[in-house]
């Protein structure tokens, strides 16, 4: 250790040759927002110096290309990619993401700590630094049934692991406001650590109360005024641009000379198709530049700002002593990535990963679909109420609206009405064979025929399905049982497409390219049936999340998120 440090110092002083020297680089300096024409010397995976260095075991002349720090994704759920962690690394490293922060609460809600162990073990040899925010909401709420639990003692134990930065997004904001002991115990266990927030629409005294608990950030802002208030009260604002959650254009005016240090870019949830076609956090940087943000500032929000918020020593900058995580590109505005270096090693070039990751998937994670036997009669929506609460989808957002509509029942049974775009939605508990089934109506999917189903359903990941009739709903759900989890489409009683996600019912075991092809095929088929949503299965996956306003459906029934209570249904 001391020998390496001594050698690093000698390289920095120019007394010993470097492992790698990058000549004629235009280095993005994230500390002073300047671009320096200079050279960079690397030794033992770290940057030894920036300046007049020319002698190295390997010398690459960048000929005036830009050299950026490796990008950092400040808040993402890797499970939303539907990829095994090895394939996920292939997708994001080639796009310049060399570090990320995740809380793994998706796989944890299915498998508990075993799911966390799988991701951390599988990522150990990857050229990608994964930092864990311990999941705070497993289960997310008392309004749904999860597959596992992580209590305050588990939180305390996990916080002692390497690469653990703090406590993950506290989605149960009502639990904070109402002082629920189990929620407060987790916050107390994480005292002194970074604590991420999740507080959609919270303002005024409730916002003050939430922040007073020690919660430092929020990524759920969808309106500029909301983001301004939260920033003014001391929060870091994570500006989100994911596959379903697109808030960048609305929130970008928040970033000014006075406020930019309190802002960072995140994706939250991004599909493998988007990762392959558009990129990861690099896509957010590119879009921010297109929307008018200075390129260097955009890079700061995806590197040094994130590193400083999470106290990631050695990440986020090209400077002496920092990890040699670097990106080479020719055009700063387009961020067309030519080369990616991880700890001084070339790991991706021209969008292609140069490493061959090995998957390490425990067999115990491959059997997670446990639905109590059911039939089509169990999917029937019955009511005697004159008005029915209906979930309305908002395209491009994960928030929903509550509609209270007069629906005519036939002998007490409510059916879908495709002319009015009123479809059936059901949620089936899939962890403990409890037999719980939630029933409701939803508007915004636009299907004219068939049904879609998914075992990806934030955050407890029960089975959620939307369709035009009970027979197709049944067929699509049964397909999920057959393939051990995933997504499925059924039309006229037949399965027409499905994608198997057998790892916890969330992740594929196949290569990135195959998963993307399968997803494109099923999405195309769904579009032909009338669905106008750009990401129908991503949207579907959020319809059972009872911590995002306004109306949701879980296996226990309809949830009014404003009151944080189940809505009684009279049958």
UniProtKB/Swiss-Prot annotation:
Organism: Dehalococcoides mccartyi (strain ATCC BAA-2100 / JCM 16839 / KCTC 5957 / BAV1)
Domain of life where this protein originates: Bacteria
The UniProt record lists the keyword Hydrolase: yes
PANTHER family named among the record's database cross-references: ADENINE DEAMINASE (PTHR11113:SF2), N-ACETYLGLUCOSAMINE-6-PHOSPHATE DEACETYLASE (PTHR11113)
Enzyme Commission code: 3.5.4.2
Catalytic activity, reaction form: adenine + H2O + H(+) = hypoxanthine + NH4(+)
One Pfam family hit: Amidohydro_1
Keyword annotations from UniProtKB, A to Z: Hydrolase, Manganese
Family: Belongs to the metallo-dependent hydrolases superfamily. Adenine deaminase family.
The protein, known as: Adenine deaminase
Top-level enzyme category: hydrolase
GO MF assignments: adenine deaminase activity
Classification via NCBIfam families: ade
GO biological process: adenine catabolic process
Cofactors named for this entry: Mn(2+)
